[in-house]
Regions:
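Hydrophobic, membrane-interfacing alpha helices
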Residues: 1-254
Length: 254
């Protein structure tokens, strides 16, 4: 039934329209999520809307630029938002300065929505025929290759959904402190899983079966790990300082 639906949409010339529509819906869902999530980080409705209007257009533009550079300045194709996840915190810092909010809170506030975009956006990739897996006899029909392929896009959706749930749990556990830890762990969890999932994609490999997007994912893991090391060291130093400022009776020195 699913294969028949994909084939029918392709034959009617609807594939790209449906894909673009779902991508836009994903953006709207992200915005709605952030509007409801804003109170956790002490943001007003207007601040939330302004933050979204600063961060997402800037991230999209950066995505186009990075794709253009990777394509040898030839075209703007092969766009994928994964390219900008490492750099999004820098855009968040700018948004935080504009809104006079904590940079750490702004960064952690945005983190779950990054993974949420993957949940929705990838769900419709099979209709467009992009991000496809390798040929598979029991797979879904791909309108580009006109063969059945492994439905890795939906596997990526499931993994991204698990990451969203994990980030929300982590943020709550941290009492929405806005230390940057949530985004750092987003980079690690999403980057590591995406690196592995890239091996299921039937795309161009650069070296040892590793694709360009897999390298971006690996870079995410490296940056996220370094980020967590810095945060853990800061927490360690704070704990040491707190012990120094407390006398043996447990009272804070004045």
């Amino acid at each position: 039934m699913i294969n028949d639906l994909i084939r029918y949409c392709y034959e009617q010339g609807w594939s790209n329209t449906i894909y673009q529509s779902i991508v836009m819906i994903a953006f709207v869902v992200q915005m709605i999520f952030l509007i409801f999530y804003r109170k956790k980080y002490g943001m007003t409705l207007m601040q939330s809307i302004i933050a979204v209007l600063i961060i997402y257009p800037a991230a999209y533009f950066l995505m186009l630029v990075l794709a253009w550079v990777e394509n040898g300045f030839q075209n703007w194709g092969a766009n994928n938002i994964v390219r900008v996840y490492v750099y999004t915190p820098l855009i968040c810092i700018v948004a935080a300065k504009v809104l006079k909010k904590s940079s750490g809170k702004m960064i952690d506030y945005i983190a779950p929505s990054m993974a949420l975009q993957q949940v929705i956006g990838h769900s419709v990739c099979p209709i467009a025929g992009c991000c496809q897996g390798y040929p598979c006899s029991w797979g879904i029909w791909n309108p580009v290759t006109e063969t059945r392929v492994f439905p890795n896009q939906w596997l990526e959706c499931i993994v991204a959904l698990i990451i969203v749930r994990y980030l929300l749990h982590l943020a709550k556990k941290e009492n929405y402190a806005g230390t940057g830890k949530v985004y750092a762990l987003f980079l690690i969890t999403f980057g590591s899983t995406r690196f592995l999932l890239e091996f299921l994609r039937d795309n161009e490999k650069l070296l040892l079966g590793i694709s360009g997007l897999a390298l971006h994912a690996l870079f995410m893991v490296i940056v996220g790990t370094a980020w967590m090391m810095v945060l853990n060291e800061k927490e360690k130093q704070k704990a040491i300082q707190k012990r120094k400022n407390t006398n043996p009776n447990g009272k804070v020195k004045k």
